[in-house]
Amino acid sequence: MLAKITRSSFYASRAVGRLSGSIPTSPAALASNCRYIQIERKRTKSHEMALYETVEKGAKNSPSYSLYFKNKCGNVISPMHDIPLYANEEKTIYNMVVEVPRWTNAKMEISLKTPMNPIKQDIKKGKLRFVANCFPHKGYIWNYGALPQTWENPDHIEPSTGCKGDNDPIDVIEIGYRVAKRGDVLKVKVLGTIALIDEGETDWKIIAIDVNDPLASKVNDIADVDQYFPGLLRATVEWFKIYKIPDGKPENQFAFNGDAKNADFANTIIAETHKFWQNLVHQSPASGSISTTNITNRNSEHVIPKEEAEKILAEAPDGGQVEEVSDTVDTWHFIHLK
């Protein structure tokens, strides 16, 4: 049976007392305020407290595998709907949910249709999906994930690209030095964006850096990426251009001739997708393609009691045989561009 709990690497930046203004002392107050519920936690060198943890269900490398999220109170949450977009709105610092760590191939993503939106591996034609290694790249070349509480609206034609949204949370690539873990929630600073046109849909790729990265104080906009990460933007465009070719698909196209837009432009796009998400999570009836079940958005008709969210986790498939990943996943593909 597999029900392993791991800890997020995203930590609170302030002590509990400063978060609340005052610390309740009565047992009733402590019980009613989730921020004071004591949970086992991993600490960084600065002894900051983890805000999120993950729970694995099902067998790894199988369709049953799911990675659920809990907040620091131990409540099951949706990483798409219950984790705030902003870690610090005043400083324009965002939360990023890591779906795919750097150098890995499994195409993991927030499951839009599954209640509480766990991370699952994408399946196509009955098989688990792995991203091909296109020479000279190995797997994903950055930490890859999504910004919570965003949604690229498929009914909206983006004026700057002329294409509709792709019906997903907005994607983000994190370029810092650390290889993150699946399910990590990072605080990131946005540097810019690339506009991938994937099968006729706008698929923004936000470029960001973990605020705890040693270079975070030096990179503040897209021009800084070329200075401190020379070659990375060029490699990023190449990666997105060719990564589907080994699967028999044509090379991807880009808006703006593949040029990256700056941080201000990216922040505007993020704000727009956040508004689309707000409409999504509050719309009635619920979207047929996306589960909007959540526990924190009180004005949403799709909010559920935390006990019901816990039941969803408890009823998720558990156990099973861990499956081996085929050696062919490590194949290097050499691409001839036309």
From Swiss-Prot:
Changing R129A: Drastic reduction of activity. Mg(2+) 2 binds at D171. Its EC number is 3.6.1.1. Its main location: cytoplasm. It holds the Pfam family Pyrophosphatase. It catalyses: diphosphate + H2O = 2 phosphate + H(+). Signal peptide: none annotated. It is found in: Cytoplasm; Nucleus. It comes from the Eukaryota. Its cofactor is Mg(2+). GO terms for cellular component: cytoplasm; mitochondrion; nucleus; NURF complex. Diphosphate binds at R129. Mg(2+) 1 binds at D166, D171, D203. One of its GO terms (molecular function) is inorganic diphosphate phosphatase activity. Component of the NURF complex composed of Caf1-55, E(bx), Nurf-38 and Iswi. Component of NURF (nucleosome remodeling factor), a complex which catalyzes ATP-dependent nucleosome sliding and facilitates transcription of chromatin. NURF is required for homeotic gene expression, proper larval blood cell development, normal male X chromosome morphology, ecdysteroid signaling and metamorphosis. Inorganic pyrophosphatase (PPase), hydrolyzes inorganic pyrophosphate to inorganic phosphate, essential for driving critical biosynthetic reactions including transcription, replication, and DNA repair. Belongs to the PPase family. This is Inorganic pyrophosphatase. It comes from Drosophila melanogaster. The gene is Nurf-38.
